[in-house]
């Protein structure tokens, strides 16, 4: 059974660029037969986005300018293991998460 794996990268840290390079490397090497990979980027200012764009944009630090970003947060409910995403219609959708890999 394929698991939903959330890779979280970026953040308000002096290690921001290291996180981006590491995330790109991890994403290039994950086994897609075992994982449905979902990426969540955090800008230097602390904004959280679901990212569906190209891995090179992560490594080149231009991912947040991409139209493939959608505001998102992790569910604050301990029992609800999901990513909450604001869709184009202004409604919230949940994406179930099995594993979180912070980079």
Describe the residue ranges of each PLM region:
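ATP-binding N-terminal substructure of ATP-dependent carboxylate-amine bond-forming enzymes
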Residues: 1-103
